[in-house]
Amino acid sequence: MPFELIERAQQRCRQRLAQAFDAFCGDDARQSRLELRDPEQLPSHERVRLPYEDGEFDWVACHELIETFGGHERQVRLLRELLRIARRGIFVSTPNRGHPLVRWMYPERHARLHDALTIKTMVDVLPGRPVWKLGHVRLAGFKSHYFLMVWKDAAAHPAQHAEPAPQADRPAGGTEPPSAAWRPR
């Protein structure tokens, strides 16, 4: 019974992550593309090197894997390697270490699970200072998973192509610049 509940929760998380990815970047994301191979098949050597050419894929997805890659430095190396093989960017999801169900499901890797601050510190040291955005998915009212989008080219970021907000939406004040609290939709 408890395992069925866990399986249903994981399936729901996968579906919500696929929907979030689809809405977040506008590409056609399917759950089958978010499936991982058996973690036992992953290379165990310290150097993270994937057998692909530079920029071989448009987008690279890494679903609930980064937290299994040892310490912080090795996880940063994994992010760098994912960026190397991606032309446009990467999508990374990871369980939130603050979610009670996640702590119960993964007690052996709880110390390596992430929160928003640890994800930010990893992205801040990536080469080229890429554009990135961090989001989350809620399960039972708690942030259960974080998802990270990193664009290699700032010009490809969706915000670079957004239409300016209509003049009627801007705050009153004539030619004064908008306040720091105001942002176009």
Q: Where does each model-flagged region fall?
A:
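A conserved beta-strand element that flanks and buttresses the S-adenosyl-L-methionine
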Residues: 61
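Short glycine-dipeptide loop
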Residues: 85-90
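A short, conserved alpha-helix within the catalytic core of class I
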Residues: 69-81, 94
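Solvent-exposed polar/charged
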Residues: 83-84, 124
